[in-house]
From Swiss-Prot:
GO cellular component: chromosome; nucleus; polytene chromosome
Lineage: Eukaryota, Metazoa, Ecdysozoa, Arthropoda, Hexapoda
Top-level lineage group: Eukaryota
Chief site of localization: nucleus
Domain ZAD: 3-84
Name of the protein in its database record: Zinc finger protein ZIPIC
Subunit and interaction comment: Interacts (via region between the ZAD domain and the first zinc finger domain) with Cp190 (via centrosomal targeting M domain); the interaction is direct. Interacts with pita.
The protein's role, per its UniProt record: Insulator DNA-binding protein. Recruits Cp190 and cooperatively binds to chromatin promoter regions to exert transcriptional regulator and chromatin insulator functions. Chromatin insulators are regulatory elements that establish independent domains of transcriptional activity within eukaryotic genomes. Insulators are proposed to structure the chromatin fiber into independent domains of differing transcriptional potential by promoting the formation of distinct chromatin loops to form topologically associating domains (TADs).
Gene transcribed to yield this protein: ZIPIC
InterPro entries in alphabetical order: Znf_C2H2_sf, Znf_C2H2_type
Any single Pfam family the record assigns to this protein: zf-C2H2_6
Key words, A-Z: Chromatin regulator, Chromosome, DNA-binding, Metal-binding, Nucleus, Repeat, Transcription, Transcription regulation, Zinc, Zinc-finger
Organism: Drosophila melanogaster
Localization (cell): Nucleus; Chromosome
GO molecular function: chromatin binding; chromatin insulator sequence binding; DNA binding; identical protein binding; sequence-specific DNA binding; zinc ion binding
GO biological process: chromatin organization; regulation of DNA-templated transcription; regulation of transcription by RNA polymerase II
Length: 457
């Protein structure tokens, strides 16, 4: 069974339609559909298994969504909460409109007195300075004042006042002619007294209490925000503070990590992680061939060798490859070029990697492993194991077609290619000048020439 996401074989599968992850629990299939929304991915009924790695990624994805939703709610609460008391205050103003009508009615008598000043206001109209008063009866009066203007507007749809402007700065108004301003000074003074009276009555005790409650609410909200912020900062630097307290006398920051599996101690977490992975980590074991790999990327690449999708085809022969660099290396065999030469023994190679590995043969310092039979030295344990098969005669690799056995894997693969496409195993670069024999490697060609047993053409 293969994972429905990474398409690799699953050793301990989970059913995405029945198993859940996260808290609160959610079906794995729902998370898969949520992650792949907007893509061409189709979740079929057959693809019902998922591997452990992909399941852990979906669990982290689900957890991040829950954290994001929680943080969004807290942010929106901080944004909207300070205005809730203000909206409540505006609502209370509307409830007190009837009480204000009684207060504003006191101003109506002054409106009638202002009507008698019609001639004086017409003179003010000529100099272009006006103040508009709209009364309940719809009478429009124009009065000039130097410091305060009281404006009352009556709605055409409702029979109540929406707002009363108590103070209006008129510094930007047109300056009234001093000779004509004194004519309306008395009327403006009366309007100012009424406005001041309304202002005092407007500020009721419960309004003062609401204002105090609003200030208290803002302070309480900010205190909650400060607590969250302090908690986050404390969570981040808690470890550092503990270490600083422990080393306060010395003034230095040190870490002492004890490995639970061995007596080793480390001064940094990075060094501890490297030690654990190199010495105590069992590695990633392939469930098909049993091979152990230390890195996860190497393990994924190894799994692709078992079930490869060979999408890169050779234009010369029927060979296909799962990776592009392997096709590039294969094409070098068709060209017959050997651009890389060893500067010690002058041996030439098709690939640079082959030359690099060959140079290690000449480097005696890297040969730390020695064969106990013939004294052959090598730098890797795998190479020593392959060499030991030449002494033991062990041939663990069998051809699946003819059951012929080989001591090395690459020999078996080369033999198997002959079954699949005879004559196209590899490009035979070495041709005998005396006969029709061709050879893949130079060693076989040299042995053929030295024997001199070929038939002339």
């Amino acid at each position: 069974m293969n994972c429905c996401i990474c398409q690799f074989s699953v050793r301990v599968p989970k059913d995405i339609h029945t198993d859940t992850v996260g808290h609160p629990p959610v079906l794995i299939s729902e998370l898969v559909l949520q992650c792949t929304r907007g893509t061409n991915y189709v979740l079929t009924e057959e693809s019902s298994t998922i591997c452990k790695k992909c399941c852990e990624k979906l669990a982290r994805y689900h957890k991040s969504i829950q954290i994001a939703r929680k943080l969004r709610g807290e942010i929106l609460e901080l944004i909207h909460s300070p205005y809730m008391s203000k909206d409540h205050k505006q609502t209370s103003y509307k409830e007190d409109d009837l009480d204000r009508e009684t207060t504003i009615s006191k101003f109506d008598g002054n409106i009638e007195e202002a009507q008698q000043q019609d001639e004086e206001e017409q003179e003010l109209e000529s100099v272009g300075t006006t103040v508009t008063l709209v009364g309940p009866a719809g009478i429009v009066e124009e009065v000039a004042e130097e410091e305060h203007t009281f404006i009352i507007k009556q709605s055409e749809e409702e029979d109540e006042f929406h707002s009363v402007d108590l103070e209006l700065d008129i510094d930007n108004e047109i300056i009234i002619n001093e000779e004509e301003a004194h004519e309306v000074e008395e009327v403006a003074h009366e309007i100012e007294e009424v406005a001041h009276e309304i202002e005092e009555e407007d500020l009721l005790p419960h309004d003062k209490q609401e204002a105090q409650e609003e200030d208290f609410f803002k302070e309480d909200t900010m205190s909650d925000f400060d607590e969250h912020l302090d908690g986050a900062i404390e969570y981040i630097i808690s470890d550092g503070e503990d270490q600083e307290q422990d080393n306060e006398s010395s003034g230095e920051y040190t870490v002492n990590i004890q490995c639970p599996s061995c007596p080793e101690k480390f001064s940094s977490r990075r060094a501890y992680n490297v030690h654990t992975k190199r010495e105590h980590f069992p590695g990633y074991v392939c469930d098909q061939c049993g091979k152990t790999l230390q890195s996860y990327s190497g393990f994924i690449g190894h799994l692709q060798n078992h079930e490869p999708v060979k999408q890169f085809a050779c234009p010369v022969c029927p060979e296909r490859f799962s990776r592009k660099f392997r096709l590039k290396h294969h094409m070098a065999w068709h060209s017959g070029e050997t651009p890389y030469q060893c500067d010690v023994c002058s041996k030439r190679f098709v690939h640079k990697v082959a030359l690099y590995k060959h140079k290690m043969i000449h480097d005696s310092e890297t040969k730390r492993l020695e064969c106990q039979v013939c004294g052959f030295k090598t730098r890797t344990k795998a190479h020593l194991e392959r060499h030991m098969r030449s002494h033991t005669g062990d041939k663990p690799f069998a051809c699946p077609v003819c059951n012929k056995r080989f001591s090395q894997m690459y020999n078996m693969k080369a033999h198997l290619r002959e079954h699949e496409s005879p004559g196209t195993n590899r490009h035979r670069r070495f041709h005998c000048s005396k006969c029709t024999h061709t050879f893949i490697n130079e060693q076989n060609y040299d042995a053929h020439v030295q024997r001199d047993d070929c038939t002339p053409v």
